Amino acid sequence: MSERALLAAQGYLELGMVEEALSELASVSAKAHSDPDLIELRLHILMHGKRWNEALVAAEELLRISPHAVPGYIHGAFALHELGRTAEARDLLLKGPPLLRKDPTFHYNFGCYEAVLGNRDSALRSLRESFALDATYRDFAKRDPDLAAIRDALVN
């Protein structure tokens, strides 16, 4: 894989230049396109560009190649949620490896999905677990539109 192309793609991503970042990734050899790191970078770029269908395909590809890749579950679920497929997003998270449950993002996103699906108690449990693992998630929750229906219960 071309290190230059990878670095250029990362740089373009940091600048918010989605098309340029994807163009750099397209320039690497066909063999490199199955590299999990490259797929994960492409996934991040697609998510940044809010290209949810393509991001979901990249997440599925990452999980085929690397079935224990935590980002494949987290980002694949997020893409599903953004596509309005929140129940599928929740189910994808639940299919992840045990290591996933140590990640505060798992608990935060799961809590958001549960809140959207109307499962208040489960949402609150999961969100509180995310806060215990990483207190910065409490700040995210204050502004997250997915949590509007349960925001009052998140105060304590």
Task: Describe each PLM feature range.
Residues 36-105:
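Alpha-helical adaptor scaffolds
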Residues 132-156:
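Terminal, low-structured helical/coil segments at or just beyond the last alpha-helical repeat
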Residues 7, 41, 75, 109, ...:
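"A position-specific structural signal for the A-helix of alpha-solenoid helical repeats
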Residues 115-139:
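TPR/TPR-like (Sel1-like) alpha-helical repeat modules
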Residues 14-15, 48, 82, 116, ...:
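Register position in tetratricopeptide repeats
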Residues 1-48:
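Alpha-helical segment of the N-proximal tetratricopeptide repeat
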